[in-house]
């Protein structure tokens, strides 16, 4: 199994994927620039072979017209934070949402945010989710989605970018947003092996 983790201190992405074969185990920290290049070079199909030794990692993959592409990167110094302690457990509330509807509604609400107020508010009521955003500079927007939710009303606010970006990377029709309250980290996940930990923001409402 290969586990990929990335964080900027305000959000964290975690993805597990199976590997066909491995001759050992280990871990390393890749620079952000290397990850950016890998995203451009990695084919949608085919194999990617990963080698590492000491402070270097090598990636070998198929390129255009059958050519082989090799990327060599230095590994960063230091010890990566214990990401397992960051992933929230025993979350009280799980919201099941249509990925596409949730993504598009967030993107529309995001248009009404500004640099000073880059926040969207989610209010989970009886079988519905209300997404709203407002700013002095742009205006305000509100949209309601139908969903399955029974129980007390829950309200939580996020930087919309921290939800929109992971939603764009997922293929599942349904996603799950899990939380305890408006102050604690929330977990966005799909049925596939991808999880995103997102810190909530304070809302002016």
Label each PLM-derived region with a short phrase.
Residues 85-87:
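Short low-complexity stretches enriched in small and charged residues
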Residues 1-16, 20-75, 90-205:
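DNA polymerase processivity clamps
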């Amino acid at each position: 199994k290969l586990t990929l983790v990335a964080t900027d201190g305000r959000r964290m992405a975690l993805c597990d994927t199976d590997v066909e074969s491995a001759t050992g185990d280990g871990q390393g920290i890749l620079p952000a620039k290397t990850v950016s290049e890998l995203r451009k070079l990695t084919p949608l199909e085919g194999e990617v072979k990963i080698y590492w030794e000491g402070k270097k990692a090598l990636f070998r993959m198929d390129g255009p017209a059958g050519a082989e592409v090799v990327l060599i990167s230095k590994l960063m110094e230091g010890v990566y934070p214990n990401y397992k302690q960051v992933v929230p457990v025993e979350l009280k509330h799980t919201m099941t949402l249509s990925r596409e509807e949730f993504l598009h509604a967030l993107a529309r609400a995001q248009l009404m945010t500004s640099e000073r107020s880059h926040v969207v508010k989610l209010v989970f009521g009886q079988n519905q989710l209300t997404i709203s955003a407002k700013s002095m500079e742009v205006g305000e927007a509100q949209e309601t989605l139908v969903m399955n939710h029974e129980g007390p009303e829950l309200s939580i606010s996020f930087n919309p970018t921290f939800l929109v970006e992971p939603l764009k990377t997922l293929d599942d029709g349904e996603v799950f947003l899990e939380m305890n309250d408006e102050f604690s980290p929330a977990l966005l996940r799909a049925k596939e092996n991808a999880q995103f930990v997102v810190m909530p923001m304070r809302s002016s409402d």
